[in-house]
Amino acid sequence: MSTDIVAQFADSALESVDSCTRITPDEFESTLSDLVIEPAVGAPLPSESVSLDGTVVDTEPSVEALGSAETGVTQAGTAIAEYGSITVESRPGGDELVSLYPPRHIVVVDASDIVPDTKAAFERFETAVRDARENDTPGASRVLATGSSATADMGELVYGVHGPKEVHIVVIES
């Protein structure tokens, strides 16, 4: 993946998230440790370069653990450099719930999953939806997010009502 597109993603993301850190796989556990507020829940990461195994993150949380978690950790399926947006995929590990319930969301992004713009992202989505339908498997659903949850439904802008109040992105560059 071009370092230019990774830099563009990081710069765009920093306009709407609390932090965006670029690291190597060897730095993952210490970076995660610095960002996590316990108790923490997570969905198993499909990444080949990093894992939540051996961390304080519970990857098989109960409903109670999910409800009391301060931090949720998921991996983005696709990241869009143009806007600093990420997608949370619907996977068996409960990525959507883990990304929405805790007030702090840590998003792991493999640099190879960063695309330049929404057109490229939707081309990836189209392929994934087609594959899911052809194979009769879940995974076609995606949540597209740019920054923390914000709403002005009742007048004043409020953060964290319909999702996380804080978002921290960790980009893994191999």
Residue ranges and their predicted role:
Residues 1-174:
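The feature marks the mature, well-folded catalytic cores of soluble enzymes
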